[in-house]
Amino acid sequence: MSAACISYFGGKKLKLTHSYAGKELKHWNQAAFISGIERLLGLYKPETTLKQMNMMTSHDTDRMLDTYGGDEKRLKLSVIFSFLFPGAINIYYGEELGLPGAFNAGTRQGMPWKNEKIWDKDLLGLYKRLAALRKGDEAIKHGKFEFLKEYCDGRALAFRRSSGGEALLCLMNNSSSEVNLALKQGALGNKPGAVLNSGVKLKPAGPKKLTAVLAPWAYAVYRL
């Protein structure tokens, strides 16, 4: 999962000083990313996937900030996808603070507990909100994952987690240009309300229709 996220969200900023499983990662377009994730989900039974550990980084990889070429906008999209993906997320210490570091030499330094000036408080806040959301939501912990391909246009990415009567829908814009998505009636529920939103606006587009306007690198999570 982490290799797929890096290949897709990294884009032209992708920067690695090592290989993953002996393979050099290259930029994936959206079609390749969706295909790769669906192939991964097809390898195991759903109940097995929910128990697997999703390691984003470790002491044997570059830190996320370096991997994404210092581009925090791309990093955040990858973090959100990883938190909402089935399985048990594993966060290497310091990633939530935006610590930099290349493989080996820069990934094993001590935690800067006493130097809060270098902490990225905005990124830390996002991690905290995602952790709280994940902890309290059955759809994320136990639900089905699916891409909403009618809203995946090469720039905008949409996916849903659902379990019983609970569901979450995530929209994100993995591009540097604004995206307008025409949403079907009821796509975001009867009373759309985002539990997480940065740069997504909903506009009426006729009787019971909405247009989601996604700013560059925007994201939003809606409880359905």
Stretch-by-stretch model annotation:
Residues 89-93, 138-146:
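Acidic/polar loop patches that form or flank catalytic/metal-binding clefts of enzymes
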Residues 58-62, 97-99, 164-166, 174-177, ...:
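Short, solvent-exposed loop/turn segments at secondary-structure junctions
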Residues 59, 82, 94, 130, ...:
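Hydrophobic, well-ordered secondary-structure elements that form the walls
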Residues 185-200:
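Solvent-exposed beta-hairpin/edge-strand motifs
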Residues 148-187:
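Carbohydrate-binding surface patches
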Residues 205-224:
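C-terminal beta-strand-rich structural cap/linker in extracellular carbohydrate-active enzymes
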Residues 4, 9-11, 50, 54-72, ...:
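Aromatic/acidic polysaccharide-binding cleft in carbohydrate-active enzymes
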Residues 1-44, 81, 100-129, 133, ...:
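Active-site-proximal helices and loops of the catalytic beta/alpha 8
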